[in-house]
Amino acid sequence: ENGLTGTGTQALAEACGCTKANLYVYFKNLDELIIDSTAYCMSKVEDDFLAKAPTDPKDVMRFLEEVPYWTAKKHGKKYRLMYQVYTLPKYLEHGKKFFQGVNERYTQYAKELEPKIGIPYTVITPLIFIFVRACVHYAMFEDEYYLKSQMEVLKQSVLLFLEKYNNQYLKPKDASN
């Protein structure tokens, strides 16, 4: 709830329903607890995000509209904690490692999408990164202007790439004019 501020091992133990001593059965020290807990939490957030990701090309536009708000509501506090942890110089290398994995997983997802929507994964991957960045920024700061600006560029990009690669799956009905 409060990120790292005012959160000690006693509060963490209470939240986990155990004693402080029990925490150290699983973690060598507080740093390991923070690093491992953050990585686990964010892996669950990413799993939720990818579970909502479209598998049917016709769902892409709906996904672009709905997911930023869902992400903010469901995961905003978790994103703020992650950034608080991973931007500390002490944990920066762990953040870099986490995001390297994110890059690999989203690139793999883009490769899986390529045959379904007819756009090369090398084009899809940066679009995913822009989308995720916009979602995370909105989840952390609820900056509607930034979100809408990013979403408009993404939607236009998707339509342009669909036209370029002659894919009819994602075009809205009124975009065919």
Give the residues covered by each predicted segment.
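Short, basic, alpha-helical segments at the C-terminal edge of helix-turn-helix-like DNA-binding modules
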Residues: T9, T38-E46
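Short helix-capping/turn signature of helix-turn-helix
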Residues: F27, Y83-K90
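Hydrophobic alpha-helical connector segments
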Residues: D36, F49-K74, T125-I128, M151, ...
